[in-house]
């Protein structure tokens, strides 16, 4: 991986879309006032993800993965220009916004990586630490590499993993908003106009975010850090509503119009209704579980096993050469765990563990104490072939198609549009999907009672 270098400084847009502050002329050399961005096949998109407390496991610790571009946008480009074969990732912005008071003591880490790689060292693109005491943190970087539109891993060619610490919110609230913007360019055969032909992953700008090395996370070896990626989960979704409106630019619209595309996404079946907050009741989970492949170390060509929490990670590193012992599931055959809250199920699990004489604890005060079951992960593609609806991930998408360079402009105006795919137009709750063979009790706590003993590896 190329060494990260300091690139062009830009002013991060406050209260707007950070990716809109990135000049296309910073990345490409053929930008001209006489050429439209649409003619150059340059697109600006932004996704907005809501992170719910059910997506955050005990002690305010949670790691989630976010693909950057929905396949529906790729299909739209292919319909307009069938000869298009590749997409170049020009710039990427990641904004993490706190939906709570300032100076609450919430911080975290963010990784940008290419999930198509098998090794962590080659997959890593960018990593930084952020602090939400000021309410928001943003990093803008340039991945600067192309991907084939026929690649089954297109949606995962740039993924963002965000880990929060000390985020102790109650169930069914929205404490965090993650905005991921990208500037990409579609092309046919070869893109010779890229200015930086040597480096990838160079930093453009940062606000309340500090780029970090591996040592800053308390790990000594890269292959140990790669274990962290076995926590990652992705949420396959479908577009349920599409809107498009135009915003006049300049005086009386003399500067033209800015086209805004808005996508709303949902996970699970189309008939799933929006859930209202109801403390003590857990949200039903989709059964379409899938696992994200883990990374292998370049030194040890073996696949890393799935771990539940950071304590599992530490225990695994200490005992990686020793015997692996399984943890018995506390959900016995014939027991009913439906229609109870996650906390009630946790207490029932702890009581069952005491009766069975189990030595494992699910949670303890002052730390994340959960022991996981190691297991191999299945390789599953998250992108479908051309002509089929792919895997879209997100809650909201805004696209810019402006003549020339795009700068930070306010986005406002009435909302109006139409439905697609026949789904409900109301926003829907994103559901986390399975992340591999995890500890059974930890799965039940996070994902609900449908994760039964058949999720445990057959060897145990």
From Swiss-Prot:
Start-end of Basic residues biased regions: 368-379
Cross-referenced Pfam families: MP
Keyword Transport: yes
Region (Disordered): 267-314, 349-460
Highest taxon of the lineage: Viruses
Alphabetized GO MF terms: serine-type endopeptidase activity
Keywords: Host-virus interaction, Inhibition of host innate immune response by virus, Suppressor of RNA silencing, Transport, Viral immunoevasion, Viral movement protein
Coiled-coil annotated spans: none
One GO BP: transport of virus in host, cell to cell
Entry keyword annotation includes Protease: no
The family this protein is said to belong to: Belongs to the tobamoviruses movement protein family.
Annotated function: Suppressor of viral-induced RNA silencing.
UniProt-recorded name of the protein: Putative movement protein
């Amino acid at each position: 991986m190329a060494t990260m270098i300091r690139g062009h400084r830009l002013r991060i847009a406050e209260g707007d879309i950070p990716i809109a502050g990135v000049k296309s002329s910073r990345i490409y050399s053929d930008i001209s006032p006489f050429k439209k961005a649409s003619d150059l096949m340059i697109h600006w998109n932004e996704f907005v993800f809501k992170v719910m407390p059910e997506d955050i496991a005990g002690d305010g610790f949670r790691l989630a993965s976010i693909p950057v571009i929905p396949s529906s946008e790729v299909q739209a480009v292919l319909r307009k220009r069938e000869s298009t074969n590749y997409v170049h990732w020009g710039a990427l912005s990641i904004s993490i916004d706190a939906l709570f008071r300032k100076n609450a003591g919430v911080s975290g880490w963010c990784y940008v990586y290419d999930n198509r790689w098998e090794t962590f060292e080659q997959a890593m693109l960018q990593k930084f630490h952020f602090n939400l005491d000021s309410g928001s943190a943003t990093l803008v970087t340039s991945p600067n590499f192309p991907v084939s539109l026929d690649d089954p891993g297109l949606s995962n060619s740039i993924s963002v993993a965000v880990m929060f610490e000390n985020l102790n919110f109650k169930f069914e609230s929205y404490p965090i908003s993650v905005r991921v913007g990208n500037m990409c360019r579609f092309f046919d055969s070869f893109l010779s106009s890229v200015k930086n032909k040597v480096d990838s992953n160079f930093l453009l700008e940062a606000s309340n975010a500090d780029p970090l090395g591996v040592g800053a996370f308390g790990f000594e070896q890269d292959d140990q850090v790669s274990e962290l990626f076995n926590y990652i989960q992705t949420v396959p979704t479908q577009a349920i509503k599409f809107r498009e409106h135009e915003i006049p630019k300049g005086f009386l619209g003399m500067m033209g119009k800015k086209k805004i595309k808005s996508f709303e996404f949902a996970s699970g079946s189309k008939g799933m209704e929006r859930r209202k907050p109801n403390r003590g009741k857990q949200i039903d989970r989709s059964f379409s579980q899938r696992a994200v492949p883990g990374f292998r170390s370049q030194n040890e060509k073996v696949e890393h096993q799935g771990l539940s929490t950071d304590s599992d990670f530490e225990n695994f590193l200490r005992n990686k050469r020793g015997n692996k012992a399984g943890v018995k599931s506390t959900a016995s055959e014939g027991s009913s765990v439906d229609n109870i809250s996650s906390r009630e199920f946790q207490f029932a699990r702890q009581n069952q563990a005491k009766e069975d004489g189990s030595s494992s604890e699910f949670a303890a005060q002052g730390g994340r104490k959960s022991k996981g079951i190691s297991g191999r992960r299945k390789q599953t593609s998250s992108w479908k072939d051309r002509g089929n609806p792919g895997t879209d991930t997100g809650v909201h998408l805004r696209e810019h198609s402006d003549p020339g360079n795009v700068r930070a402009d306010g986005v406002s105006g009435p909302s109006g549009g139409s439905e697609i795919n026949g789904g409900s137009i109301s926003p829907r709750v994103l559901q986390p999907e399975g992340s591999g063979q995890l500890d059974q009790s930890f799965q039940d706590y996070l994902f609900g009672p449908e994760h039964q003993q058949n999720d445990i590896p057959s060897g145990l």
